[in-house]
Amino acid sequence: QDKIYLYDLTNTYFEGRKLDSKLANFGRSKEKRSDCKLVVLALVVNVEGFIKYSNIFEGNTTDNTTLPQIIDNLRTQTSQEKRAIVVIDAGIATEDNLKLLQEKGYDYVCVSRSKIKDYTVNPNGTIRHLMTKDNQFITLQKVEKQKETDYLLKVKSTGKQAKESAMKSKFESRFLEEINKIETSLNKKNGVKKADKVHQRIGRAIEKFPSAAKFYDIEVVEENQIATKIVFTKKKTSQQNDQELGAYFIKTNLNTENELSVWTIYNSIREIESTFRCLKTDLDLRPIYHKNDDATMAHLHLGILAYWLVNTIRHQLKQQKINHSWQEITRITNTQKVVTTYGKNKENEIIYVRRCTEPNEKVKKIYAALKYKNYPFTKRKSVVHKSELKKNKTQHSSKTNDG
């Protein structure tokens, strides 16, 4: 029985117009293919990556509307003696959905949909430091907020901080460049100087770079409705925002004080991300070329069946400390080949000999973990006799004449 369920959705796009399809609809493509119609695939996966439940929705289905149906079906199709934990991402974690999970008898772990402000930190509380598998340094710290009953965990990542800082600097420099252009035009002969026009230009710059503009106070100095100067100063809140770069908040209704346990449970959602990546990339789930909805459903269901086989193999390998992706497994095992040699003997008969090449050490390691033989067969020999050759030639000749 599973104690943790990971729930998420993905979508894949169609090639073609799909005019008569009920499934295909325009929506928010996770692959940025806004020009194509989509179909949505919802999966519930356990921490070992095995699919416990799946459903297919129309392409315009939003993430946060699917949970009620999934939870009801999951309850009827799985047996749970203990209270299970559902891990979801921010797109699904609306207040209504979190309330629904509690009512249905589930605990939840999710990322807060927005950055939590005005929180307090226990001065005597502990800050945990750890290194992730991809060599990212993170800190874990419990925080509290008034009227918030959930356990809140602040997670700060150096990798995420560097990325967000670079993006902030990029947009900020572009915003200031726009403001400087507007100010420079005030001193040009044919530049825009009318105050209302200058305000419009500043408004467009703010609309274009809202994430950077919110940290600046901008004032236009006027004389007789003519702008003479633009004064912009940086707000103090910008420094406070810099301190929060790279941080996100995990919330849960679990009764726990273990920061590492909460983060580990939430981090297991990487497994469902790996599932979607395997389905789309390794098993060619995307794009979909089928014309009718029945063929589309078959395509998606066959992809899920193929994933079951892939994950079973990967699960067995992981138990032996082999953590390769499916792409890497196939690359390694494809180094062993079957070689077919043929020639004619004195009786003019064709002789075929098939042999397997020697597997390298990496292949042997995978075979040993899966309890496979190093060779599917040692040597196979077959002979095509003269009578069979003549018969085949006669049949081929008659087919040619008939055609």
Predicted region positions:
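Anion-binding and metal-coordination hotspots
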Residues: 1-403
